[in-house]
Amino acid sequence: MADNQGVQKAGDVKIEQLKLISSTNVIYDLTEFLIELNLYEDIFSNYLTGSIVLSDSRNLFDMVPIIGEEYLVLKFITPSFPTSVQKTFRIYKTSDRQVVRDKNTQTYVLHFASIELFYDVLLPLFTPFEGEITDIVGDLFDSYIAENRDFQISEAADEIKEIENVTPLYVKSETANKVKFVSPGWTPFKCINWLASKSIPKDGKAKNFLFFESNKSFCFTSIETLFREAYEDNTSIGKYSISAAGIRQSDNRPDIDREYFLAKDVEMVDTTDHIKNYTNGYLANRLLTLDVYNKEYVVTDYDYINEYGKQYHTSGEGKKAMPIFTGDSLRNPATNISFYPVNPKLFNDFPDNVSEKMKDIYGNRKSSLLDLTNLRMNISVPGRTDVEVGRILYFSYPAVSPSDSSDANETQEDTNYSGYYLITAIRHKVSKMNHTMVMEIVKDSLTTEKTVK
């Protein structure tokens, strides 16, 4: 973390730019109108979204006019931190417009999303692709998504120019399989999502690839890679615990370093539902691959309990991670059956295309992604602009009673719910003076011997 110089309290924020660029290239500073800005990122979303609640006593809505096709230049930073959240977005909708304060002020909400989304939805592709999956993903991104779509605004706010500030794509996991297909009018994002669902990693066992945008970059990776990197490189963002009131140093000043890692409004969203897991394919599932050329079918059963120890999890290596089930847990692959067509003669010069690999991918991917739905929490913490989805944190969930008469409650952890969690979604709530993150965190294993100090 940064040295906190210039930070008065955890959650301090500096909004360096909040500019609206109209369809006629007129610039408006929205900072004085701001009530609250919300920025959303999610590992299951290809792009960022957000909304701004504005209080307008100057009739900006009609003066611009705001019609839902404006650009939003956003930059905010945690004071003394090295990284900021910076991006140019596109306004796509207005809502909740109402007059308040004796008809002298109006409030409304502007909804925005990543600029890349608008180029994506308007670009159906009818194009053939062939090669390594990660190479195709890179080509799709470079050719159709990664263009210069950022703006630089002068301090005098009277000049706009486009700059080379492309949101980068990081491919964290290389794939081992090749694919050949023709896009049937899919957009670039849909093509990449389809490729993610058909990817086999070069390193690792889990076929849980995703394509998403964080507040720093686009990312194409397997979830297992995120777990392995955090575990091997010790890149957890820190140890969080539930907030207690009145935490101060002896000089009665806030302990800012500690308060950054105090969570409040902790909500347990999902816990293990074994009846659901018996039937949704999590513990075991079956795939019927139908060969439309040879008129044959193959039954492939996948048993996650037998495969769990071969993969990395939130707690680290599979052989050290403790699953939420036992080796004797009930399961029957026939409770969850799926079908997939195989056409080995679709391309004469391309054997082992993706359809022939699905028996190795489908069950593994289904189980490992469902593993992220068993233990899920929402926590509210002071905002930091160096945090993004896809990172790992340690959350200390308190035990309700001491282990013996000599122990203090506050030093004990619940062994089931404490441990490493993956940040799957963040809602950044930003006002003029404060930044709060509401984080969705999940784990796919229970506490192991390795702990965070």
What are these regions (language model features)?
Residues 1-124:
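Assembly/oligomerization scaffold segments
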Residues 42, 55-57, 77-79, 92-99, ...:
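Solvent-exposed coil/turn segments that connect beta secondary-structure elements
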Residues 121-131, 177-183:
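Second-shell loop/turn segments in exported
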Residues 14-16, 48-50, 70, 85-87, ...:
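Envelope-exposed proteins and targeting segments
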Residues 62, 144, 196-199, 203, ...:
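Sec/Tat-exported extracytoplasmic proteins
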Residues 39-65, 242-453:
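An acidic/polar, Gly/Ser/Thr-rich interaction patch typically located in mid-to-C-terminal regions
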Residues 105-106, 111-118, 130-169:
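Glycine-rich, acidic and aromatic/proline-enriched surface loops and short helix-turn segments
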Residues 107, 156-273, 279:
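Short beta-strand-centered interaction patches in the first periplasmic/extracellular domains
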